Amino acid sequence: IYNHFLLPLSLSLIIFSCNNKEGYKLDMTAENIEVNWIGYKTNEKTAVSGSFSEFSSDRENQSFNSIDDLVDGLNFSISSLSSSSGDPIRDLNLKDYFFKYLTDNFEIEGTLGRPINDSIDVSFNILGQDKTVRFAYSTYLTTSKYSNKIIQIKGKLNLVNQFNGEAFNSIHKQCFDLHKGSDGISKTWEEVDVHIK
């Protein structure tokens, strides 16, 4: 028996800092970018996670005077066909009953706003309409293999109020029985947690 779930959108971006007065350089090669998601089902709020393997942006190999300048206006694109949850049947259901109704050509596109103190606006283009969501924003130093400064964005997305309700209804209907918990009630969570770093 396969457990299917609703997909939230979540990115994980690792930023490389030159750490000098000339500015910052963003190194967005495949090996130092993570794009992750977590979804929830059942009244017990069972979490299921996965990741996207294909991500691109318009800020690769460019230098900026600050992290804020680097982030402000960054356009990104994620191939939803690259979503993997470790369950091929679940991934196929997400493709045919969720992403098909959420995006054109299975591409999730968006733009990051300019950070303001501890928050940032992220605009998603959903079937030609821009949907803007505010998230918590922070940066921290790291000694990772790829970078010494990481951007972290946290928040919630509501896939009915903020995104295309048709996509939510489609995946909920397809996975109705699979989203039943121990109480026998089917639950697909509309609100999802997002963690970008």
Give the label of every model feature segment.
Residues 1-6:
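Bacterial N-terminal signal peptides that target proteins for export
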